[in-house]
Design a protein with these regions (language model features):
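Glycine-rich FAD pyrophosphate-binding loop
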Residues: 1-6
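Dinucleotide-binding Rossmann-like beta1-alpha1 core, especially the glycine-rich loop
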Residues: 9-89, 98, 214-215
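Short beta-strand to alpha-helix junction loop
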Residues: 18, 25-28, 53-62, 101-120, ...
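Flavin-dependent oxidoreductases
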Residues: 138-144, 149-243, 252, 261, ...
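Low-complexity, small/polar and acidic-rich linker and loop segments
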Residues: 421-444
């Protein structure tokens, strides 16, 4: 879930991609689908709309170019706001702002919960997941791919979908396809602010460049404000470290939109890595290779990849139909997923009733975000179990407040060890190699 969970968390409306590209087509379709499926899957989703803010006369003229591009892409409801209309929406905006392009269909989402929710729903409908399973090579028969070789054995299928993100180019080359592309890892760094110190209502963008939508300022589904990203060439595909220079760059650019931002109120930083294709078009690559049957490549799915994701799935279905695959809709498919209980969102009456049923919900483990032991146990025993500290954190939002886990860490380790029947030294932050406790200093 690397890039899928470390991004701007925006369901873009679709005004930015060049018309007549896969990005343009799938962004607009994907946006519409997200509005439909987010409630079904219990995904935190806020219909905020977004504003592209112009500073000065020259930038205001560029809003009309973006407006025309959005109309060509089929984005509904676009409107250019004058200065007064913009300040009524966001009074903290730079006084030099001259107007904005308003896109009402843009939204913010919790990207990790969205990814997890889709996976849990898939599992409920019969999909099997294999974790810590590494792809090694393809299995061929008569020049057709019929399966894959992994560290846990061989698996066979009529089709293999290469959706390996940052490594999708390497998978495609492993199959000896004619795809002439490399994934260039471009890092984007972000800063998260304390929700009690800094508040905006919407998503704010600067005028975009050819290569980036720029440094945004956005509300989140959890009430915090997030700023970023920048765009720097990553050291490698796993380079998610944040840098002093990157933080300074983000703050400087964000202050062009809201000058009153105070970096002292930041509580966390993170970075994600974009899967930027080396092709000149910079468009999504979604294809069945002409020289290799049985494989579908999804390469270069950078922004607006998350917003486009459900539409990409439908696009792949059409590719399969085009080559003669007879697909049947699963009649008993259940699109509904029950979301996790979030204690802090409940009314006092609902809290009392829940604690009566299960006293574990009455024991607060994370004070900042009011996450209870009951929620942690739910996450550990969920359809796709949380077996690490970060797994718990992502599902419950534990450890994301002002103290960044300083209070809850030892308590979560104890709960994980107890529920998984493991020694505390075996509990990890995010999987093998990230053990938190190395040894006991004494026995109790």
């Amino acid at each position: 879930m690397n890039t899928s969970s470390a991004n701007s968390a925006i369901i873009h409306s679709g005004y930015d991609p060049k018309p007549d590209t896969k990005k343009a087509l799938l962004n607009v379709k994907g946006n519409k689908i997200w509005h439909e499926i987010a409630p079904e899957l219990g995904i935190p989703f806020k219909k905020t709309g977004s504003f592209v803010v112009a500073i000065g006369t020259d930038e205001f003229k560029k809003l009309f170019e973006l407006f025309d591009r959005g109309i060509a892409n089929g984005v509904p409801g676009l409107k250019i706001l004058n200065r007064d209309e913009l300040f009524k929406k966001e009074p903290l905006i730079n006084p030099d702002a001259t107007g904005a392009l308003f896109a009402p269909t843009a939204a913010v989402i919790d990207p990790f919960t969205a990814t997890l929710a889709a996976a849990e729903n898939a599992k409920a409908n019969g999909v099997e997941f294999l974790f810590e399973t590494s792809f090694l090579d393809f299995i061929y028969e008569n020049k057709k791919i019929i399966g894959i070789i992994t560290n846990k054995g061989n698996f066979y299928s009529n089709w293999v979908i290469n959706s390996a993100g940052l490594y999708s180019d390497e998978i495609a080359h492993k199959a000896n396809t004619l795809l002439d592309v490399s994934i260039i890892p471009r890092k984007g760094e972000y800063i998260i602010f304390d929700s009690s110190k800094f508040f905006i209502n919407n998503v704010l963008f600067p005028i975009p460049s050819e290569n980036s939508k720029g440094c945004l300022i956005s509300t989140t589904t959890h009430g915090n404000v997030m700023i970023g990203p920048n765009a720097r060439l990553a050291k490698n595909k796993e380079d998610t470290e944040t840098t002093k220079e990157g933080m300074e760059e983000i703050i400087k650019n964000a202050k062009k939109l809201i000058p009153s931002i105070d970096e002292k109120n930041s509580i966390a930083t993170f970075a994600g890595v974009r899967s930027t294709p080396s092709t000149s078009e910079k468009d999504f690559i979604i294809e069945i290779p002409k020289n290799v049957y049985g494989l579908i490549n999804l390469c270069g799915i950078e922004s607006p990849g998350f917003a486009s994701a459900p539409a990409i799935a439908l696009y792949v279905i059409e590719l399969l139909k085009d080559v003669g695959e007879k697909l049947e809709e699963k009649r008993e498919f259940n699109p509904i997923r029950k979301p996790f209980v979030h204690f802090h969102l409940l009314s006092y009456k609902e809290r009392e009733e829940l604690i009566k049923k299960n006293p574990a919900y009455g024991r607060i483990v994370c004070r900042c975000e009011e996450v209870t032991e009951g929620e942690i146990i739910d996450a550990i025993h969920s359809p796709i179990p949380a077996t690490t500290y970060d797994g718990i954190k992502r599902r419950t939002w534990l450890g994301t407040g002002r103290c960044q886990g300083a209070f809850d860490y030892p308590r979560v380790i104890k709960i994980l060890a107890r529920e998984l029947n493991l020694p505390e030294e075996k509990i990890t932050k995010k999987g093998i190699g990230s053990e938190i406790i190395f040894r006991k200093t004494k026995d109790y």
